């Protein structure tokens, strides 16, 4: 479900589920986690993460095992692996990054975004709640006001606007991302490791307040989540009740 190639000091990892728009199931998450962890065993000094086909990652595979009991823990381990990697991870965002795909993009240290790509958290369309890290990191990358629009109304963030906010560092292709990663790989690795560690320790990872956890659990355990799934299968708008 992933492809791994290396050119000199740049390791490229490609999500390879184009038929599902690279949606994350447990197997893909596990393979990606292991690839990130093993990346430091060789001569690589930078990682490029991209998706095969027209999407970077369409989020969690809602038709698969995304609601399995251990799926959230697997996803957390993936994010921990990316955060702990001593190498910079450059996201080559080749298409839409939605939901868990946007979380994956935000965990990258830098992002080169295709002109027709966009970012979206459609959680309010599915009755779901986001963890605190995702909300805090989104706010730091796009600004508080735009984060509110994305979270409360499921607004899409285009590549052009993402470049202005800082979500996108550059507009470009996979080749552009690989070229940038090659430049970075020639820089001093210890200096990069220190900068990455300090930047990532920005307070976005926090213990949820009791009120946050209560509302989070209430959303995930609600009938609205079931209604969203049923409506999706029946191809109709959901009728949310707030319960």
Curated annotation (Swiss-Prot):
PANTHER family reported in the protein's UniProt record: (7AS)-7A-METHYL-1,5-DIOXO-2,3,5,6,7,7A-HEXAHYDRO-1H-INDENE-CARBOXYL-COA HYDROLASE, ENOYL-COA HYDRATASE-RELATED
Entry keyword set: Fatty acid metabolism, Lipid metabolism, Lyase
Catalytic activities: a (3S)-3-hydroxyacyl-CoA = a (2E)-enoyl-CoA + H2O; a 4-saturated-(3S)-3-hydroxyacyl-CoA = a (3E)-enoyl-CoA + H2O
InterPro entries per the UniProt record, alphabetical: ClpP/crotonase-like_dom_sf, Enoyl-CoA_hyd/isom_CS, Enoyl-CoA_hydra/iso
Gene Ontology terms, MF aspect: enoyl-CoA hydratase activity
Gene: echA6
GO biological process: fatty acid beta-oxidation
Pfam families, alphabetized: ECH_1
UniProt-listed SUPFAM superfamilies: ClpP/crotonase
Membership in a protein family: Belongs to the enoyl-CoA hydratase/isomerase family.
Origin organism lineage: Bacteria, Bacillati, Actinomycetota, Actinomycetes, Mycobacteriales
PROSITE patterns hit by this protein: ENOYL_COA_HYDRATASE
Record-given protein name: Probable enoyl-CoA hydratase EchA6
Chain's role: Could possibly oxidize fatty acids using specific components.
Protein's organism: Mycobacterium tuberculosis (strain ATCC 25618 / H37Rv)
